[in-house]
């Protein structure tokens, strides 16, 4: 077997992963970057991000760093890290201009000036878009073109990372699996940019690859995790059956004036929050959930008819087309919507340059907890966090570059041996197992939680785990995904049980009030067991 050394190994090919790979390939001496993706290059949560990217831009005279900090802290409900928020806000102008230098094209007006839009809980227009409502796809398409043509970036598609190689709390590489064969990639810089956890829930706006792999890998490696109870449910996913189920109806539609209404066409958000339809997402999701219960239906409606045909076609071409494909005319018809798991505020505890509690292990993007998002992410802050942390990571690694070759000693070689043992003849229906897990999480650890529901979810997950006998080694990529989903689900439920209050996206109907003092839930794996730490 060949044991190859790399300047950096990046696991995940969304915006944070690809941007980190590109910046590292540009900044490191004799760069040799390995970019690993579980599906095809560019298939990620980032690709489906419609709303846009936040930036406090020098071109936008009505905005300021102070204003963006204030909005982010208000949405974060006491759990944001002020220094992280300030750094990312201050850095946004530089990094977004670098994206533009790399060839990303943001929407502009007829005078060639950047267009800024408004979204929920933002006090000013500061969100930028690519092609109206295809921002994630626009950014990722350009980054994919760069990374796939770079001589310094090797891309491995349809390959999953199954274990991080750690010794004495230092990460030295990872074990990869392409569905048939295993291989080891060695590096002093291993970057997890593996995305979110949406597939843990029955309803989600996330693609099928969002199975919490990065968080499960980091947990198994002993890295500290933080605030895993905070799952953001987007209020407006398209409530239709079939291939378009849970397609995201961007918050930007409400930012331009659309209203949530009941089946009689009556707006209802005024009775839930002073900001009405532009209230923080947790508030709007719970409001939708309550209205659905009142009406005895699985959806409410979004009324975008007052926006008019011209604005709809200009700003929301993707959403408009998706609605038309489902027999809905946005300019004339109400859109059936319901909440769906959308974004994970929790994750691996990391600095703004991706460093974690394990030397050599870096985490960026949605699987990281940097302190920007707090208990409830501000709309469109996620793509900003992806690019700023990737950019800062590349700067840090350049400054501390270690070119020493990692030798494949007996410790490393022995790590691989277990993966070639016979597994026996057990075959698992992973689709059925995933569906069972998704229902458990939706019912017990979803939008509105309580002790009884969480305890029931905890017990049901233990029972589900007893049906799945794989421990370290699995037969295929789908089994590895399910193993990761099970691990992260149990961690989320444990963290949700520990937080006996309601804060941000975590709502406990048995503890509806927010404590005066905000505290993080931090956890790690010690002696093979979950341990909460301060």
Where are these regions (language model features)?
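Conserved redox-cofactor binding core of oxidoreductases
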Residues: 101-181, 193, 237-240, 260
């Amino acid at each position: 077997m060949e044991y190859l050394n790399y300047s950096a190994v990046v696991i995940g090919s969304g915006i944070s992963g690809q941007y980190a790979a590109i910046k590292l390939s540009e900044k490191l001496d004799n760069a040799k970057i390995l970019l690993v993706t579980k599906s095809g290059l560019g298939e990620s949560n980032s690709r489906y991000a419609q709303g846009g990217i936040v930036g406090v831009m020098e071109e936008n005279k009505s905005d300021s760093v102070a204003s963006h900090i204030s909005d982010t802290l208000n949405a974060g409900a006491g759990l944001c890290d002020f220094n992280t928020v300030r750094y990312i806000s201050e850095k946004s102008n530089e990094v977004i201009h670098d994206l533009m230098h790399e060839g990303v094209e943001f929407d502009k007006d007829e005078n060639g000036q950047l267009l800024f839009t408004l979204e929920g809980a933002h006090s000013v227009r500061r969100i930028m878009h690519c092609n109206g409502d295809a921002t994630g796809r626009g950014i990722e398409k350009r980054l994919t073109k760069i990374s796939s043509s770079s001589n310094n970036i090797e891309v491995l598609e349809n390959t999953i990372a199954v274990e991080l190689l750690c010794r004495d709390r230092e990460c030295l590489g990872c074990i990869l699996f392409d569905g048939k064969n295993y291989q080891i990639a060695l590096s002093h810089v291993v970057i997890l940019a593996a995305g979110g956890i949406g597939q843990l829930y029955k309803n989600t706006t996330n693609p099928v690859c969002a199975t919490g792999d990065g968080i499960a890998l980091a947990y198994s490696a002993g890295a500290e995790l933080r605030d895993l109870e905070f799952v953001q449910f987007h209020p407006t996913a398209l409530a239709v059956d079939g291939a378009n189920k849970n397609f995201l109806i961007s918050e930007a539609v409400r930012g331009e004036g659309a209203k949530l209404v009941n089946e009689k066409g009556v707006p209802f958000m005024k009775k839930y929050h002073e900001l009405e339809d532009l209230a923080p997402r947790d508030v709007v999701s719970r409001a939708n959930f309550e209205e659905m219960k009142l009406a005895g239906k699985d959806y409410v409606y979004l009324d975008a008819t007052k926006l008019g045909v011209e604005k709809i076609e200009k700003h929301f071409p993707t959403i408009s087309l998706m609605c038309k494909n489902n027999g809905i005319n946005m300019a004339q018809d109400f859109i059936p919507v319901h909440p769906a798991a959308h974004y994970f505020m929790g994750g691996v505890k990391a600095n703004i340059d991706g460093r974690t509690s394990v030397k050599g292990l870096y985490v960026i993007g949605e699987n990281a907890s940097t302190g920007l998002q707090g208990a409830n992410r501000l709309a469109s802050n996620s793509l900003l966090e992806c690019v700023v942390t990737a950019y800062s990571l590349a700067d840090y690694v350049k400054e501390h570059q270690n070119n020493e070759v990692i030798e494949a000693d007996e410790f490393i070689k022995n790590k691989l041996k277990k993966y070639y043992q016979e597994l026996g003849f057990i075959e698992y229906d992973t689709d059925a197992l995933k569906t069972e897990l998704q229902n458990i999480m939706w019912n017990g650890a979803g939008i509105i939680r309580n002790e009884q529901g969480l305890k029931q979810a905890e017990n049901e997950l233990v029972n589900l785990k007893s049906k799945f006998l794989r421990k370290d080694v699995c037969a295929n990529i789908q089994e590895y995904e399910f193993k990761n989903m099970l691990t992260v689900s149990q961690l989320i439920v444990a963290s949700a049980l520990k937080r006996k209050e309601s804060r941000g996206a975590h709502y406990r109907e048995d503890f509806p009030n927010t404590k005066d003092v905000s505290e993080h839930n931090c956890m790690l794996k010690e002696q093979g067991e979950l341990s909460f730490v301060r």
